[in-house]
Amino acid sequence: MTSATIPGLDTAPTNHQGLLSWVQEVAELTQPDRVVFADGSDEEFHRLSAQLVDAGTFTRLNDEKFPNSYLALSDPSDVARVESRTFICSEREIDAGPTNNWMDPSEMRTLMTDLYRGCMRGRTMYVVPFCMGPLGAEDPKLGVEITDSEYVVVSMKVMTRMGTAALEKMGQDGFFVKALHSVGAPLEDGQADVPWPCSDTKYITHFPETREIWSYGSGYGGNALLGKKCYSLRIASAMARDEGWLAEHMLILKLISPENKAYYIAAAFPSACGKTNLAMLQPTIPGWRAETLGDDIAWMRFGKDGRLYAVNPEFGFFGVAPGTNWKSNPNAMRTIAAGNTVFTNVALTDDGEVWWEGLEGDPQHLVDWKGNEWYFRETETTAAHPNSRYCTPMSQCPILAPEWDDPQGVPISAILFGGRRKTTVPLVTQARDWQHGVFIGATLGSEQTAAAEGKVGNVRRDPMAMLPFMGYNVGDYVQHWIDIGKNSDESKLPQVFFVNWFRRGEDHRFLWPGFGENSRVMKWIVDRIEHKAGGKTTPIGTVPTVEDLDLEGLDANPADVSEALAVNAQEWREELPLIEEWLQFIGEKLPTGIKDEFDALKERLRDAE
């Protein structure tokens, strides 16, 4: 089939010649049965969802409990991001750095072009225009994903500002990121499809210089929804380096004091460290309120007043389901319950509702994420996959801040880094200054969980929680953070803090109750910004004493809180070789400023008790 005979190619709703020629080129290569330009309408969502139900990909859920919501069960081989198959194909290998997989871009293009040849036979090729961040932005970051997956089109409507409005923003010659995706499962004439098409061969490839994303073989999450990690972090971090801003793996939280003053806080945590829970915080301190602007990604640019302003480039939440419940995150549960949600790899109850580990109640019988019968206390495997997801519109969140769609963004007062550490790292620490803050972010360590590849319990260094998401060399990335500070008025920069909700006592109990009680730590952070709270100077930064925290009404042992705040110099001296090993791994591009901070920390710890 030539491009001239592929239905839909000649009825494109745009005159953008760059887009049209790319669409034609991809259609000739991949040989779909037809081409459809996605418009992002509700009608399209309903039509494609019904199509997915007919195909066996979607199960429509109980409309009384989850209106207009669906469950998809993936192929068991296609359940998560695949870091081992993710590549940064910069022109020079040094520009990808030691944390990324690299292949020569011309070799990768040749290899993947061969994979793409004929890969959409028997399928529809969808052209999906989208915008990351508010459509009204001065410099909107536009993209077009070409995909052969209806699941992707439906999910992109939830996760991005997708469709006709984004296409119109491109005009006749506007720049856009080219994002090409195929599940890699062509259908021959008469061949029956499967509910979740994918391929054993997978590549998720980024070309930072040309701002392109090529993905093949996976239909799942961040591998296939190319506006998410691929564009919003890997490609956007390269854009941010070139344009003088930050694209970060951060939530954006609005805290409102009893005096009705708002503070905006960005926070970077690795997976399974409570990012979504903090983004949707329900403060336990009387008079304090919280609203959310995002739970995963923040783009921060300097405003005219010299402060950093953040926007959330996403339009929906793509959250991990297990562990989400009415205690840990009631606002996420309310958002999901409003409907219009796509669940992936959770379990199905007998009355058409969803269930996962951590939810209240113990259903006696379920259909598990593999489509098998599951019985309470009899089946040994989990009912939901540990990385199962909900994809739900942000606009449904009951505590969504009114500024969530403001193209100007919100001024950030504090940046938090955090990890999961049983020992050593106190509940909260304030950095000495911006460069020291960059150092504690760049050396962030977190114990591994089921959400990350590697041995559970090992401390993995995860700079700014961006280890899998940096679109260029980690040393250059950290230097860019230092340069952001050098090129601005430090008095206008956010204060930097490090938090650890997960410290345990000798009896292995958590020392801090967490969840809504984390508002007490957030209050201390705000009071430090306002120069109203005390703290103790330690070799690692300023740490509150028990008396510095507002613990009124807290059901916790003060001795536990004191232990959670403790800075043990010997434990930190034992941490130094682990940090040094990580800095050596960064290699020749390690910024001098980070080496200086490490030497200064060693010096401060030398004589500390």
From Swiss-Prot:
Q: Could you confirm whether the keyword Cytoplasm appears in this record?
A: yes
Q: In which pathway does it act?
A: Carbohydrate biosynthesis; gluconeogenesis
The note on the cofactor says:
Binds 1 Mn(2+) ion per subunit.
Alphabetically list the UniProt keywords: Cytoplasm, Decarboxylase, Gluconeogenesis, GTP-binding, Lyase, Manganese, Metal-binding, Nucleotide-binding
Give the matching SUPFAM superfamilies. Answer: PEP carboxykinase N-terminal domain, PEP carboxykinase-like
> Which Pfam families does the UniProt record give?
PEPCK_GTP, PEPCK_N
Record GO cellular component, one term: cytosol
Query: What is this protein's record name?
Result: Phosphoenolpyruvate carboxykinase [GTP]
Q: Which gene encodes it?
A: pckG
